[in-house]
Amino acid sequence: MTMIAWMQHFLETDETKLIYWLTFLMVCMVVDTVLGVLFAKLNPNIKFSSFKIKTGVLIKVSEMILALLAVPFAVPFPAGLPLLYTVYTALCVSEIYSIFGHLRLVDDKSDFLEILENFFKRTSGKNKEDK
């Protein structure tokens, strides 16, 4: 019973929950980067580029810095923590989606603007030739 109480101690405050979200986000970022580099090296169809690796790492570091800097601004406000949890959840989902894209479990080559354009074409019933 003392072990359960000890584990519950880590979830008593919102600050510790934020630390767990940030840790999970960092783990997802590391796994995504390692898988991206590994698959780029192993796949002969993909040109291995150190510039792409540097760009990806720079983006991940900047996302983590922004996630850390958001904490002191969000905590004093009543709606700050739910907003922060939402942002952290969105970042984690984005990283997990990228990991699934590396593993070819999802189609990561979809063009969002093309999907929106097709949706509006179907709803309006007009084509580009109708203009």
Swiss-Prot record:
Pfam families the UniProt entry points to? Phage_holin_4_1
Respond yes or no to whether keyword Transmembrane is given for this record. yes
Superkingdom, natural source: Viruses
Keywords recorded for this protein, A-Z: Cytolysis, Host cell inner membrane, Host cell lysis by virus, Host cell membrane, Host membrane, Late protein, Membrane, Transmembrane, Transmembrane helix, Viral release from host cell
What the entry lists under InterPro entries is as follows: Phage_holin_4_1
One GO term under biological process is: killing of cells of another organism
The main location class comes to host cell
Q: Where are the transmembrane segments?
A: 53-75, 79-101
- UniProt keyword annotation of Membrane present: yes
* Protein family per UniProt: Belongs to the bacteriophage holin family. phi29likevirus holin subfamily.
Q: Can you quote the domain comment?
A: Isoform Holin has 3 transmembrane regions whereas isoform Antiholin lacks the first transmembrane region.
Full protein name: Antiholin
User: Gene encoding this polypeptide?
Assistant: 14
